[in-house]
From Swiss-Prot:
Name by which UniProt lists this protein: Translational regulator CsrA
Annotated organism of origin: Desulforapulum autotrophicum (strain ATCC 43914 / DSM 3382 / VKM B-1955 / HRM2)
Matches recorded under NCBIfam families: csrA, PRK01712.1
GO molecular function: mRNA 5'-UTR binding
Subunit and interaction comment: Homodimer; the beta-strands of each monomer intercalate to form a hydrophobic core, while the alpha-helices form wings that extend away from the core.
Length: 81
């Protein structure tokens, strides 16, 4: 991990098109601004983790639902024969 020290108003550039700027330094918080193209997803880590967990849960449910649908489809096909 690269650790840098910056003052209010100073920036860090990530590649050619992403800039992270220190906006304010408070007692227990640091406010940063991120300038990035709209094609780049910028999320707080806790939001990213929540989305990741929801995706895992929904993919598990989809497999189960797909298996149930396949079973129903197979039963229906046998009845039609």
């Amino acid at each position: 991990m690269l650790v840098l020290t910056r003052k209010v108003g100073e920036s860090i550039r990530i590649s050619d098109d992403i800039v992270v700027k220190v906006i304010d330094i408070g007692k227990n918080r640091i406010r940063i601004g991120i300038d990035a193209p709209s094609t780049v997803s910028v999320l707080r880590n806790e939001v990213y983790e929540e989305i990741h967990q929801e995706n895992i849960l929904s993919s598990r449910g989809s497999v189960t639902d797909l298996a149930k649908a396949a079973t129903l489809w197979a039963r229906k096909s046998k009845k039609e024969e």
